[in-house]
Amino acid sequence: MTKRTLGGTSRKRKRVSGFRVRMRTHTGRRVIRARRKKGRSQLAV
């Protein structure tokens, strides 16, 4: 059996889909708005 080597990095995750990154663009703000409307406890990473 081979090991799962792709662990994921928190810095990259934040840079790609963090709250401040979302707020930068119009579509990102739309994502946040949609998640607020749906009642998500976590809006972004």
Curated annotation (Swiss-Prot):
Domain of life where this protein originates: Bacteria
Molecular function GO labels: structural constituent of ribosome
InterPro entries: Ribosomal_bL34 (IPR000271), Ribosomal_bL34_CS (IPR020939)
GO terms for cellular component: ribonucleoprotein complex; ribosome
GO BP of this protein: translation
The entry's keywords: Ribonucleoprotein, Ribosomal protein
Basic residues: bias regions: 10-27
Region of interest: Disordered: 1-27
HAMAP family: Ribosomal_bL34 (MF_00391)
Family that this chain belongs to: Belongs to the bacterial ribosomal protein bL34 family.
Name of protein: Large ribosomal subunit protein bL34
Gene behind this protein: rpmH
